[in-house]
A protein has these predicted regions:
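PRPP-dependent phosphoribosyltransferase catalytic core
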Residues: 66-182, 193-283
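Glycine-rich, histidine-containing beta strand-loop boundary motifs that form or position
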Residues: 8-11, 58, 84, 108
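Hydrophobic, well-ordered secondary-structure segments
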Residues: 1-2, 6, 49-50, 83-89
Length: 283
């Protein structure tokens, strides 16, 4: 609802009071949770939901809850739940989550199997940088007023309204730029995903293009394989839109008539990432 408070962990090093967590099995083990207003939010919230795309063992979640309870004892008085798209948590770890007072819900529950062993025979490779070639027109189409930052915490109603307003303004300008009935890629950058999804959803609803697809760059290194039975068949290695020397990836690209990057990275169009992305889309 509009009164729901939302904050997500981040791997960005930002100013303020942050709680550091470790996700041992992750490609980027350290992530942070903004604590600037967390004590007040816990006091105001009768229930707290931890959301992830996938829970594999549940250990990271249990460790996070234990760490938060040590710092915020009132968390022990709150209802806790975990929600995910996928869950492959074993029955033993499901019992540990229940003992920790965490109710779990998922959309798809996978059998607890050794998935790593199941893919050992598949010849995968890491994504490579795109080949260099002629670049299409690169420019900043629209700079919105700064949106509320979910890394530091937002009220859901305010955040979704701001994202919707920015998307409407952006698409009103985009109508003059796109070929009729073309294919549009809307691309988020790393943790800046929801604004891109909002733009893509609105573009689809209004019939701006014949097809609209939404991607996001990611720090996750995933093996690619052209086999038709394998889900990730192509990918490119890109420098981060946020600068520095970290690697990011973009998977399963298709052919598009136009690509719209929705990002909170400063001066993104002037960086190497944008030119490399344009090269990848031109391949």
């Amino acid at each position: 609802g509009p009164d729901c408070l939302y904050v997500h962990t981040t791997r960005e090093a930002l100013d303020g009071d942050w709680i550091l967590f470790r996700e041992e099995h992750s490609h980027a083990a350290e992530h942070r949770l903004c604590a600037d207003q967390l004590a007040d939010w816990i006091d105001r919230s009768p229930a707290i939901v931890f959301v992830d795309d996938e829970f594999s063992t549940g250990r990271t979640l249990i460790n996070m809850v234990q760490q938060l309870r040590e710092r915020y004892p009132r968390l022990g008085e709150r209802r806790l739940a975990a929600a995910s798209i996928l869950s492959r948590v074993s029955p033993e770890n499901q019992a540990r989550l229940a003992e920790a007072g965490i109710a779990c819900e998922c959309l798809v529950r996978l059998e607890h199997q050794d998935y790593e062993r199941m893919v050992t025979g598949i010849p995968v490779k890491e994504a490579a940088p795109p080949a260099q070639g002629p670049l299409p027109d690169l420019r900043t189409l629209y700079t919105a007023e700064p949106l509320p930052d979910p890394r530091r915490g937002v009220a859901v109603g305010c955040y979704t309204d701001c994202c919707r307003a920015a998307a409407e303004e952006l698409l009103s300008r985009l109508r003059e730029e796109l070929p009729d009935q073309g294919a549009l890629l809307v691309l988020g950058t790393e943790e800046c995903m929801y604004p891109a999804l909002t733009v893509g959803s609105l573009a689809e609803q209004t019939g701006l293009c014949a097809t609209v697809r939404c991607h996001a760059t990611t720090r996750s290194p995933i093996g690619i394989c052209p086999d038709s039975a394998y889900p990730i068949r192509n990918g490119v290695l890109l420098p981060s839109f946020y600068g520095g020397d970290r690697k990011t990836y973009l998977y399963d690209l298709a052919a598009y008539d136009a690509a719209l990057v929705v990002t909170d990275a400063p001066a993104a169009v002037d960086g190497t990432a944008c030119t490399r992305l344009a090269a990848a889309l031109g391949q």
